[in-house]
């Protein structure tokens, strides 16, 4: 399931990047503005996130499709070491398969220089700034997921919030770091485009940012972990992860434990 979700995510990234940036794309003459293309890319990938979360696979597996997310839930006690390892391996292999399928379906178009397999690469400010940016946006994304998914009211909107952040990040942050927040998202294109020089950024910064978010989450909640490891609890699929306490009606109540 996680392999399929990561594959869909990377297939969508390659297909949208080809549509928006390939010189032979029929929409190229109508989209000369780079900022507009990034906004459309963000909207497309945000909708992709929503679609993945709401599939039967996403409802069952939790819709991580990101080794950094899986590592964070392992840290929070929701997953066993073996489950986390298999999840991560599936996500990485799925990302590779997604890029391969996009290349096959689109007859090699994602390899074009302007598209470069929808790779996530450091922007104009260099590797150091890209690392910091990836850590920050990953911290914000995981903080939003953890706090909303464990709130009785807001948990219904966690997947919408996560998708919205992805869309905003791609539209406005991608010139800085390429916008990954996901080692698998970067790994798939890197395999085919041989983009190795900055791979370490995307394998280190997102996990560090998300793990930092988990520490803040635990601190605010007085050490109480999350209910489940899903982005969408309100469905007919049982939680396959280690259960936590019931959803909090108010985050403020749990924060009283550290007062």
Named regions from a protein language model:
Residues 1-259:
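Membrane-interface helix-loop junctions and terminal tails of multi-pass membrane proteins
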């Amino acid at each position: 399931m996680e392999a399929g979700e990561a594959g869909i995510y990377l297939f969508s990234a390659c297909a949208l990047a080809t549509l928006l940036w390939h010189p032979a794309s029929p929409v190229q003459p109508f989209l000369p503005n780079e900022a507009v293309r990034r906004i459309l890319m963000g909207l497309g990938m945000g909708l992709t996130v929503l679609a993945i979360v709401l599939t039967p696979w996403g409802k069952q597996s939790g819709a991580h499709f990101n080794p950094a997310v899986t590592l964070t839930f392992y840290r929070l006690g929701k997953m066993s070491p073996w489950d986390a390892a298999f999840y991560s391996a599936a996500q990485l292999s799925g990302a590779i398969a997604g890029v391969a399928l996009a290349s096959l379906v689109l007859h090699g178009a994602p390899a074009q220089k302007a598209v470069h397999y929808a790779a996530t690469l450091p922007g104009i400010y260099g590797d150091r700034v890209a690392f910091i940016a990836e850590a920050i946006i990953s911290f914000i994304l995981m903080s939003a997921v953890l706090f909303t998914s464990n709130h009785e009211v807001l948990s219904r909107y966690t997947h919408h919030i996560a998708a919205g952040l992805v869309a905003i990040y791609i539209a406005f942050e991608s010139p800085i770091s390429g916008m990954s927040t996901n080692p698998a998202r970067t790994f798939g294109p890197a395999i085919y485009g041989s983009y190795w020089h900055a791979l370490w950024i995307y394998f280190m910064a997102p996990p560090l940012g998300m793990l930092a978010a988990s520490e803040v989450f635990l601190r605010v909640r007085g050490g109480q972990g999350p209910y489940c490891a899903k982005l969408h609890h309100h469905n007919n699929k049982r939680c396959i992860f280690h259960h936590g306490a019931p959803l909090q009606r108010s985050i403020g109540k749990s924060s009283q434990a550290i007062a």
